[in-house]
Amino acid sequence: MATFIAPVAMAQYPQLTEEAKQAYQKMMSEERRRSDEAWAKALPVVLKEAKEGRPYISWASRPYDLPQARIPAFPGAEGGGMYSFGGRGGKVITVTNLNDRGPGSFREACETGGARIIVFNVSGIIKLESPIIVRAPYVTIAGQTAPGDGVCIAGESFWVNTHDVVVRHMRFRRGETKVWHRDDSFGGNPIGNIMIDHCSCTWGLDENISFYRHMYDPSEGQYESKDLKLPTVNVTIQNTISAKALDTYNHAFGSTLGGENCAFMRNLWASNSGRNPSIGWNGVFNFVNNVVFNWVHRSSDGGDYTAMFNMINNYYKPGPATPKDTPVGHRILKPEAGRSKLDHKVYGRVYADGNIMEGYPAITEDNWAGGIQIETQPNTDGYTENMRSNRPFEMPYIRITSAHDAYDFVLKNACLLYTSPSPRDSTSS
């Protein structure tokens, strides 16, 4: 369970001792070395397949930079990532044990080069000692193939640093409270063509699940670069849970999301103090038919002066940790422009309609009657009406229902695992 902070508190990063910093650097240095070794083996296969029709496009920054399939990734796929190739047509790799690494492990399957479909003949908890970094493109992770109660990735982060990735019916429980390592349960530097479906992401130490940008290094082979910060493109997160982020660092946050041609629908954000979600990129942010429950000091916020928001038919349900009779307690969205480099204030545009704020009938009737709140900055009076759009911005295909129907659907179906006699574990319930 997350331990909630007072509504006035803001995110703070831990003050690390030199010993803790050295422990983190040692762990990541070793993992980078191992990942580089795996990538050196995978890259020739990736380049060979690129010549055969599966291009590797690490520099993609626009939706049309990445080719897309002619048919959806699976029946029911929607949004910007619906035409991801994933591992379609590639080899099938079976995970045969719950080991952190080695033959038959989930890590080995993820680090393998070439188009691949990862299936499981084991179920249980895969306890990681260091992050898994997926660098080779064209992969489908089919968690629904696991027997019993499915598979849970725990102990460390799962990072996607490539394109054309489909992940379904998986649990990511970062957990662990190593004071020297704070990160997401599920994140990374995703390039694009990303489809996340029916996953449960909890116990993050930064956010539970975040997809919005990738850091591109033209020299390749490196993990961090200040050269180019590019958007993730063609991304969908659907039917997924982001909940119960850990407050070890006063940072119990749900998600940072965004990118170009992105869509986030029929998901549940529950019992995270903030970032439910936060918008981490410009362009059009499509947030449709989601349920947000029990936030503390932040519901949905972010973006910049170039951002556009489609906030359509979502259900906001204040919980026991949500402050009553304060603006944040009935906030649908807080657009921001505080990081703008301009010498004058300009905010993005917002289309907000059909959202329910439980317990606030006036806001439910008119989302602009207190639900859309400008950031707290000097000289912002008068901007709210200028942000308002009376029509939705262009978005990828999303099957839209009413907020009431979305609430019922999400509570019954988000993170529902195929074949399991217990479709949700206690953390997802």
Predicted regions and their residues:
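Active-site/pore-lining binding-face segments in mid-to-C-terminal subdomains
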Residues: 297-414
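Conserved small/polar residues in nucleotide/adenosyl-binding loops
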Residues: 418-423
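Acidic Gly/Asp/Thr-rich repetitive segments characteristic of extracellular carbohydrate-active
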Residues: 74-118
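Bacterial N-terminal signal peptides
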Residues: 1-4
